C-alpha cells in the first residue's frame, strides 16, 4: 500500500519564502523546517510583535524583510545571522539596535527607518561591508563619531531626524554617492563636505543652514542639490563649480540675489527659486541652455532678464506672485514653452512676442492689471487661458477691438480690463499648501500658534467693508495641515514616549505608553 507523503517532506530545500501581507501574528512554524536552505524570508506588512528564539536558527538567511510590523524588540541573537546581506526592519516599534549587530559582518543593505530609536549602537561602524544605510525618521540626535569607518557606504539616508551637526569622520566616506540629511536641525555644513567627490545626490532641505561652504563647489559629480527650507541669505560663487548639476532646489530661503556663476551650470534642467526675496535675476541665467523648468513663484521680481529668451528648452516657467510690471519681448524666444504662469503680478500689458512661443498651451495671467491682450495670441493653440480666479472655463470667447492709444488691434472679453487689486503686503497673505514659506520674517512663537496661519484657507466675504465692520461674519474653512505639521506632531508623541520609556524602563507596560501617546496626539 502506498502512502501520500506530505509535500514539505518531499522538498526540504526551499531557498525563498514570501509571506508578505498575510495578516500574520506569529512567525509560521513551518518556516523552521527549511532552516538549512532558507536564504530569503519576506514577512513584511504583517502584525508580528516578537521574534521567537527559534527564529534566529535560520542562520543561512541572506535577505530578511520585516518592515511594517509591530515588532517591539530586536534581540541580541541577531548576531546569529552572520551571512545576512539585506535587512529591513523599517516601520516597527523597535526602541534600540543591539550592539551584537556588529557580528552581521556580511550586511550590505540595512533599513531601520521609522522606529523609535534615538541612537545607533557604538559598534555599528564595524559593519564595514555596508553600502546602503537608511535610518530615516527615528528621532536620531547624533551619529557615532566613527561613522566614517563605514568606508564602503554608497547611500546614507538620515532624513527626518534631530541631528544638529555632522561628525568630522563623515567626510571619510569617499565612496558616498547619495547623502540625505533633509528635515534635521543642522546649522552648519562642514567645509570638508567638499571631500565627498563621488557624491551625486545631496539633500539638505528643511534644516537651519544660513550659508553653504565654498568647498561645495568641489562636488563636480553632483547631479542633484536640494537646500530648500533653510535660512540661506546668499549662495557662494563657487556653486558655479557644480558643472554636472541637473536639479537645483533653493526654495524657501532668504536669498536676495543669485550669483552670476549660475550661468556655468550648462547641464541644469530644473531650477526652483520660489519663496525667496529676489528682486532680479542675473542675465547669466540665459546661459543655462538645458533648463526645462524654472520656478520663481513668490519673490519680489520687477521684471525678467532679456536673456530669458535664450532658454530654448524651457517648457515650464512660473513667476506667480511677484511684482512684475513688464515682460521682455525676448520671452518669445522660449520656443519650447508649454506652460507660462505669471498670476498675481502688476502687468498692464503682454508683449505681442509671447505668440512666438508656438508650443504654449497654458497661459495664466489672472490677478494682474491687464486692459487687453495682444491679437497675436490667436495664432497659439492654447488649451487654457486664465484671466480670473472666477473663470469657469479654461478658454473664453474674445472680441477684437482697437487700442485707442496705439491704434493696434487687440483682444478683449468680459473679464477685461482686470480690476487692479489694492497694494497688500505679500508676507501677510495666507500661504497655500506646499507654496507656504517656512522662512518669512516671523517671531519665534510656539508651533501651535504659528501653524494656524500656515495652512491654506478658503474665505467667503461679502465685501471688504462688511468684513471691517463685523469680522466675526467671515467664514474661514481651513485645509488639512501641511505634512510638516503632522511630522512635528509625530515627533512630539515620540519624544513623550521616549521620556516615559526612560522613566519606567523598556520593559514597562507598552500599552499604557501608547495610550498616553494617543492622548497627546489628540490634544495636539
Swiss-Prot record:
Coiled-coil-forming residues are: 456-512
> In which broad location class does this protein mainly occur, judging by the first location in its UniProt entry?
cytoplasm
Cite the entry's keywords alphabetically: Coiled coil, Cytoplasm, Leucine-rich repeat, Membrane, Phosphoprotein, Repeat
**InterPro entries annotated for this entry?**
Leu-rich_rpt, Leu-rich_rpt_typical-subtyp, LRR_dom_sf, LRR_R13L4/SHOC2-like, Synaptic_Scaffolding_LAP-MAGUK
Compartments where found: Cytoplasm; Membrane
* Topology class, membrane: Peripheral membrane protein
Residues recorded as bearing Phosphothreonine in the entry: 480
Report the PROSITE patterns cross-referenced here.
Answer: LRR
Spans of the LRR repeats are 11-34, 35-58, 60-81, 83-105, 107-126, 127-149, 150-172, 173-196, 198-218, 219-242, 244-264, 265-288, 290-310, 311-334, 336-356, 357-380, 382-405
Q: Kindly indicate where the leader peptide sits in this chain.
A: none
Relate the assembly described in the record.
Answer: Interacts with DLG1. May form a complex with DLG1 and ERBIN, where interaction between LRRC1 and ERBIN is indirect.
Keyword rRNA processing found: no
Residue segments, region Disordered: 464-485
Tell me what this protein is called: Leucine-rich repeat-containing protein 1
Pfam families in UniProt: LRR_14 (PF23598), LRR_8 (PF13855)
**Do the record's keywords include Cytoplasm?**
yes
Look up the record and report any one GO term of the cellular component aspect. membrane
